[in-house]
Amino acid sequence: DVYRSGNDIRLGIKMGAPFFQIKNELEAKEVAVFSSNYTLYGDMSRRVMSLLSEAVPEMQIYSIDEAFLDFSFLEKDDIHNFAIQLAKKIEKGTGIPITIGIAPTMTLAKIASHFGKNYNGYQHVCIIDNEEKRKKALQLTSIDEVWGVGHRLTTKMRNLGINTAWDFTQTN
């Protein structure tokens, strides 16, 4: 299966596609292909997760490269700087740049993380902490990018005129 970097996403390469199905497309786009080293990935993940867990009182590991952190122990005005410093600490300690998305729900945090990763102005930390930011983020998020919305559900929603996460929030 294929796993992508940010550039691969912008080229339209599909996540999880079997390599043999997209081999010609990858070659045509001059994409570098590497085999997986799950032992190394697991070791690096443990290092990152260890550093994250030292920084916050509560953490939920979601996958090999994702975790949800509880920042409620911080004052609201301190969260952004704390997150930037944490991201720098992780990169310095592991060589791995991370993105931190902060929001009141896990789904919004994943959307915030997407913005932090894909828009340079955020410096890898995006916070959705008010209604204006929530509305803007949801309006800019395609329904197929929402956590838990798969291909079949995306098709059904689009047939109902639901194209963005914002559209979804406006339905009954």
What is each PLM-predicted segment?
Residues 1-64, 68:
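Residues that scaffold, gate, or flank divalent-cation-dependent active/transport sites
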Residues 12, 22, 65, 100-101, ...:
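A residue-level signal for conserved active-site and pocket-lining positions in enzyme catalytic cores
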Residues 35-38, 73-78, 124-125, 140-145, ...:
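Flexible, glycine/proline-enriched loop segments at strand-loop-helix junctions
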Residues 47, 51-55, 85-94, 156, ...:
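Generic non-transmembrane alpha-helical segments
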Residues 67-73, 137-139, 151:
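Active-site-proximal beta-alpha loop/turn segments in soluble metabolic enzymes
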Residues 69-87, 161:
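Catalytic palm subdomain of template-directed nucleic-acid polymerases
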Residues 79-144:
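Long, highly charged, low-complexity intrinsically disordered interaction regions
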Residues 100, 138-161, 166-172:
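Helix-hairpin-helix
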